[in-house]
């Protein structure tokens, strides 16, 4: 549904050049919720603004619903009209609500339809339908100043859906909201994704957002995507930075003659008592140093850091047993004080 190829964006100011996007390749499948995560300055917002050509890429291509938007970004009037038509099928929700304070909630939702030349009666019908969809039917005649932050964002979402988009872009839509309101907005986005078949591309710096609703995710650093895939694929990738960030675990070995192992489990393996089976099978005492578990995409997933007695060479067979159960295993290198992962699972 969304594909970028070799996407580059260079900003020029006062003789200086800043590369915000450096050859970004991204593929978002139809009907999925895709999260792009990264620190401030990683290039996330530049990426999402290039997807609908609010920012014109320096080079590379952007394809949405099979249409090459970069090919429509010419300078002539015809190119501009075609690009506007293509953009009408892409909704966008911003961090700041950008509601017109002098208009009622219903009038704010009607604004895109008004610009498209839709008749007044049809605009009103559509706006009320969308307000019902986001749970704000009773606020149709209210003004933005009378709404909470979460309600304002719901109006922003309804407005973004006015043109019946196939794609919804969300740029840090929950970062200004409290945790409870954030959860309700994320649930709304997931519900809309399922009810309307929307493809959702969201930008965030919060791991909880990815855990809550994303089917796939990508990690951005310095204008590049350094890791991407479905959440389940990432959890099964040895040494995955995203998996470690989604489910962080800590804990150091109690002695030099101990082996510390990070165990990642998801799907059916997450419901099996594999640690107790390991202890009974090999008659060894196992210490649990830390654990993180949650439900992602309806599946129970998590990571656990355990300590086994003896050095690594003494634990090759027990570690092999864990792998046979379908678990991802990363052996933690004790020689590094920061517990750098040895990508043992890649062997």
Swiss-Prot record:
Q: Which family does it belong to?
A: Belongs to the ABC transporter superfamily. Methionine importer (TC 3.A.1.24) family.
List, alphabetically, the Pfam families matched: ABC_tran (PF00005), NIL (PF09383)
- InterPro entries tied to this protein: AAA+_ATPase, ABC_transporter-like_ATP-bd, ABC_transporter-like_CS, ACT-like_dom_sf, MetN_ABC, MetN_ABC_transporter-like, NIL_domain, P-loop_NTPase
As for what it does, the entry says: Part of the ABC transporter complex MetNIQ involved in methionine import. Responsible for energy coupling to the transport system.
Taxonomically, the superkingdom here is Bacteria
Q: Which organism is it from?
A: Streptomyces avermitilis (strain ATCC 31267 / DSM 46492 / JCM 5070 / NBRC 14893 / NCIMB 12804 / NRRL 8165 / MA-4680)
| Protein name from the UniProt record | Methionine import ATP-binding protein MetN
Database matches in PROSITE patterns = ABC_TRANSPORTER_1 (PS00211), ABC_TRANSPORTER_2 (PS50893), METN (PS51264)
- Coarse class of the protein's main subcellular location: membrane
The UniProt record gives the binding positions of ATP as 38-45
Where do the ABC transporter domain residues begin and end? 2-247
Q: Where in the cell is it found?
A: Cell membrane
Is-annotated flag, keyword ATP-binding?
Answer: yes
Alphabetical UniProt keywords: Amino-acid transport, ATP-binding, Cell membrane, Membrane, Nucleotide-binding, Translocase, Transport
Which molecular-function annotation in GO is an example for this chain?
Answer: ATP hydrolysis activity
> What's the protein's topology in the membrane?
Peripheral membrane protein
Could you tell me which SMART domains the record lists for this protein? AAA, NIL
Record GO cellular component, one term: plasma membrane
**Reaction catalysed by this chain?**
L-methionine(out) + ATP + H2O = L-methionine(in) + ADP + phosphate + H(+); D-methionine(out) + ATP + H2O = D-methionine(in) + ADP + phosphate + H(+)
Subunit organization: The complex is composed of two ATP-binding proteins (MetN), two transmembrane proteins (MetI) and a solute-binding protein (MetQ).
List its EC numbers.
7.4.2.11
């Amino acid at each position: 549904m969304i594909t970028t190829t070799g996407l580059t964006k260079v900003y020029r100011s006062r003789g200086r050049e800043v590369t915000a996007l450096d050859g970004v390749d991204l593929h978002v499948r139809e009907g999925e919720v895709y999260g792009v995560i990264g620190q401030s300055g990683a290039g996330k917002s530049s990426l999402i603004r290039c997807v609908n050509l609010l920012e014109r890429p320096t080079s590379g291509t952007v394809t949405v619903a099979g249409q090459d938007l970069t090919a429509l970004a010419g300078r002539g009037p015809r190119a501009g009209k075609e690009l506007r038509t293509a953009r009408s099928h892409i909704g966008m929700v911003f961090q700041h609500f950008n509601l017109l304070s002098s208009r009622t909630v219903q009038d704010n939702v009607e604004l895109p339809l008004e610009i498209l030349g839709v008749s007044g009666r049809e605009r009103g019908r559509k706006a009320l339908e969308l307000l019902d969809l986001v749970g704000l039917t009773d606020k149709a005649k209210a003004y933005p100043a009378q709404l909470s932050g979460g309600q304002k964002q719901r109006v922003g979402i309804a407005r973004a859906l006015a043109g019946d988009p196939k794609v919804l872009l969300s740029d840090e839509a929950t970062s200004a909201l409290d945790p409870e309101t954030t959860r309700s907005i994320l649930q709304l986005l997931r519900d809309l994704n399922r009810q309307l078949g929307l493809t959702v591309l969201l930008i965030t710096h919060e791991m909880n957002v990815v855990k809550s609703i994303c089917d796939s995710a990508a990690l951005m650093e310095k204008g590049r995507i350094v890791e991407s895939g479905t959440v389940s694929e990432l959890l099964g990738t040895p040494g995955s930075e995203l998996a470690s960030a989604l489910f962080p675990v800590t804990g150091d070995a109690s002695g030099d003659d101990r082996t510390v192992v990070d165990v990642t489990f998801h799907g059916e393996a997450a419901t099996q008592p594999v640690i107790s089976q390991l202890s009974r099978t090999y008659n060894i005492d196992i210490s649990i140093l830390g654990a993180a578990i949650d439900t992602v995409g309806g599946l129970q997933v998590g990571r656990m850091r355990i300590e086994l007695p003896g050095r690594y060479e003494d634990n090759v067979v027990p570690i092999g047993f864990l792998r046979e159960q379908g678990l991802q295993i990363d052996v933690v290198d004790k020689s590094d004080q920061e517990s750098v992962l040895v990508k043992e699972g890649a062997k």
